[in-house]
Amino acid sequence: MQIAAYERTWIEGLNRGDVSVADNVFASDCVIHINGSPERNLSLDGFKQMMSGLVAAFPDLHITIEDQITAGDKVATRWVAVGTNSAALGNVPATGRQVRVDGLILDRVVEGRVVERWEQWDQMGMMQQLGLA
Protein backbone atom coordinates (compact mmCIF):
# COMPACT_ATOMS: atom_id res chain seq x y z
CA MET A 1 0.00 0.00 0.00
CA GLN A 2 1.33 3.46 -0.84
CA ILE A 3 1.87 5.56 2.27
CA ALA A 4 -0.80 8.13 1.31
CA ALA A 5 -3.36 5.31 1.35
CA TYR A 6 -2.94 4.82 5.12
CA GLU A 7 -4.45 8.23 5.85
CA ARG A 8 -7.26 7.65 3.35
CA THR A 9 -8.07 4.32 5.04
CA TRP A 10 -8.16 6.00 8.46
CA ILE A 11 -10.40 8.86 7.28
CA GLU A 12 -12.77 6.48 5.48
CA GLY A 13 -13.10 4.58 8.77
CA LEU A 14 -13.87 7.78 10.69
CA ASN A 15 -16.47 8.74 8.10
CA ARG A 16 -18.19 5.41 8.88
CA GLY A 17 -17.80 6.02 12.63
CA ASP A 18 -15.37 3.08 12.85
CA VAL A 19 -12.45 4.06 15.09
CA SER A 20 -11.28 0.42 15.22
CA VAL A 21 -9.75 0.96 11.75
CA ALA A 22 -6.88 2.55 13.68
CA ASP A 23 -5.67 -0.93 14.59
CA ASN A 24 -5.02 -1.61 10.89
CA VAL A 25 -3.35 1.74 10.19
CA PHE A 26 -1.25 2.64 13.24
CA ALA A 27 1.57 0.72 14.92
CA SER A 28 0.58 -0.36 18.43
CA ASP A 29 3.43 1.72 19.88
CA CYS A 30 2.91 4.81 17.73
CA VAL A 31 3.15 8.28 19.26
CA ILE A 32 0.58 10.90 18.31
CA HIS A 33 1.26 14.60 18.88
CA ILE A 34 -1.88 16.79 18.78
CA ASN A 35 -2.03 20.53 19.37
CA GLY A 36 -4.17 21.50 22.32
CA SER A 37 -4.45 17.97 23.68
CA PRO A 38 -4.09 17.82 27.49
CA GLU A 39 -1.60 15.02 26.87
CA ARG A 40 0.70 16.35 24.16
CA ASN A 41 1.81 12.83 23.22
CA LEU A 42 -0.98 10.29 22.98
CA SER A 43 -0.68 6.52 22.78
CA LEU A 44 -2.76 4.68 20.21
CA ASP A 45 -5.31 3.79 22.90
CA GLY A 46 -5.51 7.42 24.07
CA PHE A 47 -5.92 8.59 20.48
CA LYS A 48 -8.68 6.06 19.78
CA GLN A 49 -10.46 7.12 22.98
CA MET A 50 -10.27 10.79 21.96
CA MET A 51 -11.48 10.05 18.42
CA SER A 52 -14.32 7.85 19.74
CA GLY A 53 -15.51 10.84 21.76
CA LEU A 54 -15.43 13.08 18.69
CA VAL A 55 -17.27 10.55 16.52
CA ALA A 56 -19.92 10.14 19.23
CA ALA A 57 -20.35 13.93 19.58
CA PHE A 58 -20.50 14.41 15.79
CA PRO A 59 -22.21 11.26 14.45
CA ASP A 60 -22.57 12.75 10.95
CA LEU A 61 -18.86 13.62 10.83
CA HIS A 62 -17.49 13.72 7.31
CA ILE A 63 -13.83 14.37 6.58
CA THR A 64 -12.57 15.25 3.12
CA ILE A 65 -8.93 15.04 2.10
CA GLU A 66 -8.12 18.28 0.31
CA ASP A 67 -4.45 17.62 -0.44
CA GLN A 68 -1.73 15.03 0.17
CA ILE A 69 2.02 15.12 -0.37
CA THR A 70 4.42 12.24 0.20
CA ALA A 71 8.17 12.37 0.68
CA GLY A 72 10.21 9.36 1.75
CA ASP A 73 8.48 7.72 4.72
CA LYS A 74 6.19 10.71 5.41
CA VAL A 75 2.78 11.79 4.15
CA ALA A 76 1.24 15.21 4.76
CA THR A 77 -2.54 15.50 4.57
CA ARG A 78 -4.67 18.65 4.56
CA TRP A 79 -8.27 17.90 5.51
CA VAL A 80 -11.64 19.52 6.19
CA ALA A 81 -14.17 18.04 8.62
CA VAL A 82 -17.87 18.90 8.78
CA GLY A 83 -20.27 17.61 11.39
CA THR A 84 -23.19 18.43 13.66
CA ASN A 85 -22.68 18.39 17.42
CA SER A 86 -25.67 16.26 18.35
CA ALA A 87 -24.29 14.53 21.46
CA ALA A 88 -22.19 15.61 24.45
CA LEU A 89 -18.56 16.48 23.80
CA GLY A 90 -16.87 15.40 27.01
CA ASN A 91 -18.81 17.16 29.77
CA VAL A 92 -20.27 19.79 27.40
CA PRO A 93 -23.87 19.19 26.28
CA ALA A 94 -24.69 19.01 22.57
CA THR A 95 -25.25 22.38 20.88
CA GLY A 96 -26.97 21.12 17.73
CA ARG A 97 -24.64 23.32 15.69
CA GLN A 98 -22.75 22.30 12.58
CA VAL A 99 -19.01 22.97 12.43
CA ARG A 100 -16.41 23.07 9.68
CA VAL A 101 -12.84 22.49 10.84
CA ASP A 102 -9.57 22.53 8.89
CA GLY A 103 -6.54 20.48 9.85
CA LEU A 104 -3.13 19.16 8.85
CA ILE A 105 -1.52 15.81 9.58
CA LEU A 106 2.05 14.63 9.08
CA ASP A 107 2.44 10.86 9.41
CA ARG A 108 5.60 8.78 9.38
CA VAL A 109 5.01 5.27 8.03
CA VAL A 110 7.38 2.37 8.70
CA GLU A 111 6.80 -1.23 7.59
CA GLY A 112 3.20 -0.56 6.63
CA ARG A 113 2.08 1.24 9.81
CA VAL A 114 1.92 4.83 10.99
CA VAL A 115 4.54 5.04 13.76
CA GLU A 116 4.34 8.76 14.47
CA ARG A 117 1.78 11.47 13.80
CA TRP A 118 1.80 15.24 14.17
CA GLU A 119 -1.69 16.73 13.95
CA GLN A 120 -2.81 20.36 13.99
CA TRP A 121 -6.44 21.42 13.72
CA ASP A 122 -8.47 24.53 14.46
CA GLN A 123 -9.82 23.66 17.90
CA MET A 124 -10.56 27.31 18.77
CA GLY A 125 -12.51 27.74 15.54
CA MET A 126 -14.55 24.66 16.39
CA MET A 127 -15.30 25.98 19.89
CA GLN A 128 -16.36 29.34 18.44
CA GLN A 129 -18.67 27.68 15.92
CA LEU A 130 -20.22 25.68 18.76
CA GLY A 131 -20.80 28.92 20.70
CA LEU A 132 -18.45 27.81 23.48
CA ALA A 133 -15.69 30.41 23.05
Features from the language model and the residues they span:
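C-terminal and inter-domain tail/linker signature
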Residues: 1-133
